[in-house]
Structure formats: structure tokens, C-alpha cells
Amino acid sequence: MADLSNTKLNYVTFNQDHSCLAVATSRGFRIYHTDPFSKIFNSDEGNVTIIEMLFSTSLVAMVRSPRHLVIQNTKRGSIICDLTFPTAVLAVRLNRKTLAVVLEEEIYVYDIGNMALKHTIATSPNPNAIFALSPMSDRSYIAYPMPKPREDQGERRPAHAPPLSEYVPPTSGALMVFDTTAGKAVNVIEAHKMPLCCIALNHEGTKVATASERGTIVRVHSVPEGHKLFEFRRGTIPSTIYNMSFNLSSTLLCVSSSSETVHIFRLASAQNANAGGAGPAALETPGSPRANRWSRSKSIDGSEYSPSGDSDSSPRGETPEAGPSGPSAARRQSGTFGSMLRRSSQIVSRSVAGAVVPYLPQSVAEMWEPQRDFASVKIPKPTNAGDALLGPCL
């Protein structure tokens, strides 16, 4: 990717089966094979802000100007469709039957076979394009934050004022699941207490992962039933979740956030994990690096323990960074009396939870002890943070 050294990156994303990588730049776009890594297509025509592929086909969807979407056949070099929208295009997703285009207050759903508009979905203001489309067309679901109707209809507004939108920003973490084949909403999942920050559907469209604005808890529900399957603890410090992605077999979930750490969670039941020696007891044996991480976790002033919701309740923090050694570092590690007291309290809380949780029903136990990641990676901070929008992280 040396040819991108002097080019501004606008958008980076994998295709639906992660076999290709598409890169949108200020000078066209590039498409790469991931295994083995090699460039398979290059275009230097104009500024491309968003690009999405349709599996490994030659069909790509591109945004070149804020309200302008182009569907192009890269093999023939021809434009298949040219669409203009009333407001800026914030996100685009495709599967073999559906094209979904996200605006700030609407989602346009097209039949990809003939590019006919099938549905227009009104949403709450969604400037961050929080939304997901399942890659498989057999179970074609769209997931997005549940719209909140406006209670104040603005009766006292002056006549010359523009009309108010139908919905207001959501105040809860409810998730709407829309079936694009049936053309209707099929379920509302109460995923979090706080508004949603990130949504991801797995390859088959049977699971949905969600994170709230707090970013400490990640939950996985079944689709369309809405049963909670997993609950994971990303960390204790609130953070913005940028992306989540399932692997193709839906056994792993990758989460990236503003903490500059990528967490990988294993989607396995507690019984299976313990049977395979990968449960919490096996992973966090005394003296292990993960167990030692507990004692080095960062404390939060004024935090309170709450066994449910998205509260900052877990004693576990982010992966510690390697710092300088010496007397000053030793003083920082020892901390104040207050931090030592908090660490002692956390250790006692963990001991109590470890003794009590095995005797509780599973639904209650997971509230006390959400599953942790089994791997995490600390990534370097980019020189120009925010220059590129990133697609799925796995």
C-alpha cells in the first residue's frame, strides 16, 4: 500500500466475507485481496468518501459528493446507477438482494436487482449512521436505534419556521429490527439503558451485537427473537465504540474503541467455555498475566458498584501500557491511600462475586460477572486521528 503514502484516506472497509479490502481516498479508490494480500483494482478518478463492495464481485457503491451515490461495475468501467438524495449520505451497506443507504433521518432500501426503491424508513436523528445490514440475503435484516416520537409538536412555532422532524434523538438503548424481505419491523430489543453507539449483525443475520454510548458493556442478542445470548465487559472506563464485527463462523466478536485497544471476545456458553478449559477460572488462574492485570487496573474516583446495565461496575480496566521504570514510576504505581483502599475493596468484591456466582441462576450470574475478552491488542495512535472512517474491524 505504498501508493497511498501521499494520499488522504477517507474510508477503509472489508467486503462481506472479508476476502477483499476496499480503500477510498482523495484520489480514487483501491481494492485489495486479503489472502494473499495483493492489489486487484486501482482507480485515480476523483475524491471518494465512502466505498462498499458486494462480496468479491465487480460491483461497488461509492459516494463522491455528499448527496451523490454511484453504483459502478469496475470490470466494465460502467456506471450502473446514479442516485441523488435530499441530504448527505452517511453510510451504505449491501447484500446480494438489498442496498441500504443511511441519511441522518432516513434509511432508503433498494432492490439491488433492478435498483427499485422498496422502503423508506424514518429514523431518529442519526448523524453517526448507527446501523447494520446482515450480509446474507436469506435473512436480510436491518438493525438501527428505535425512533423516539416527538412529544412537542411545536404548536407555538412561527409560521415561517421549517417543519419539525417526526422523531427526536433516542434516550434509551432500544434496537429496532426491520425485515427487508417482508418490509416491516419484526422486533424491538431492549439492549441497553443508554442510547446506542454501535451495532453489528453477524454473517447469517442470526445475532446482533450492541454497545451503548458508555461503551463498557457489549451485548449479543438473537435475531429476530431478541433473546440475550452474551454479555461482555470491554472495560471500566467509558469509551466510544467505533466498530464491532463477528467472524464468519460467529465464534468471535472483535470490538475497537477510542481507548486504542481492540478486544476479542469468544462467543461460547459458560458451560462450553469451562469444559474446554477456557472459562474465567481457567483463564484467570492466580499468577497468570490476566489475573495480575486485576491488581494493576485503574481506579475511578467516585465510582459505585452496580451489578447491571452499562454502569462502570467492573474492577477490570484497560490493558495497561508499558511505562518507564524508576522511583517516579514506583510512586505512581503505589498510588494514594484512597486508590489503595479502592483496590482492596475491588479485590473483596471480586472474591465475594467469585464465591456467590456459581450458586446463582445463569441470568442472575451474568449480571454480576459479564464475560471478559480472551485477547486484546493495544494499537498505536494514528498521526492524523479521525482522517479515515473505518469499516468492520475483523
Curated annotation (Swiss-Prot):
Membrane topology summary: Peripheral membrane protein
L/FRRG motif, short sequence motif: residues: 232-236
Stored Gene3D superfamilies: YVTN repeat-like/Quinoprotein amine dehydrogenase
InterPro entries for the chain: PROPPIN, WD40/YVTN_repeat-like_dom_sf, WD40_repeat_dom_sf, WD40_rpt
Keyword Membrane: yes
Biased composition (Low complexity): 302-312
Polar residues composition-biased segments: 331-342
Renumbered ranges of WD repeats: 4-42, 191-231, 236-275
GO biological process: autophagy; protein transport
Coiled-coil stretches: none
Compartment annotation: Preautophagosomal structure membrane; Vacuole membrane; Endosome membrane
Superkingdom, natural source: Eukaryota
Residue spans of biased composition, Basic and acidic residues class: 148-158
GO cellular component: endosome membrane; phagophore assembly site membrane; vacuolar membrane
Pfam families from the UniProt entry: PROPPIN
Keywords on record: Autophagy, Endosome, Membrane, Protein transport, Repeat, Transport, Vacuole, WD repeat
Chain spans, region Disordered: 146-165, 274-342
Subunit composition and interactions: Component of the PI(3,5)P2 regulatory complex.
Domain writeup: The N-terminus might form a beta-propeller domain involved in specific binding to phosphatidylinositol 3,5-bisphosphate (PIP2), leading to the association of the protein to the membrane. The L/FRRG motif is essential for the cytoplasm to vacuole transport (Cvt) pathway, for the recruitment of ATG8 and ATG16 to the PAS in nutrient-rich medium, and for its recruitment to and dissociation from the PAS under starvation conditions.
Functional summary from the UniProt entry: The PI(3,5)P2 regulatory complex regulates both the synthesis and turnover of phosphatidylinositol 3,5-bisphosphate (PtdIns(3,5)P2). Necessary for proper vacuole morphology. Plays an important role in osmotically-induced vacuole fragmentation. Required for cytoplasm to vacuole transport (Cvt) vesicle formation, pexophagy and starvation-induced autophagy. Involved in correct ATG9 trafficking to the pre-autophagosomal structure. Might also be involved in premeiotic DNA replication.
Family, as annotated: Belongs to the WD repeat PROPPIN family.
Protein name: Autophagy-related protein 18
Organism phylogeny: Eukaryota, Fungi, Dikarya, Ascomycota, Pezizomycotina
